[in-house]
């Protein structure tokens, strides 16, 4: 709903910020709580 959120890595490391524009998916770019995803961390402006 907000356009951003956080991913909790399985390895217990710190949560990772994710913006909806980074989601590579056809159609509506959203993630559901608890959904399993794969991701690559990229540095960007804060």
Curated annotation (Swiss-Prot):
One annotated Gene Ontology cellular component of this protein: cytosol
MF GO annotations: DNA binding
Gene that specifies this protein: cspA
Annotated CSD domain residues: 1-46
Induction: In response to low temperature.
Protein name, as recorded: Major cold shock protein
Organism domain of life: Bacteria
Localization (cell): Cytoplasm
């Amino acid at each position: 709903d907000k356009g951003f959120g956080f991913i909790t890595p399985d390895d217990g490391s710190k949560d990772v910020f994710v913006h909806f524009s980074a989601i590579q998916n056809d159609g509506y770019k959203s993630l559901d709580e608890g959904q399993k995803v794969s991701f690559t961390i990229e540095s960007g402006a804060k």
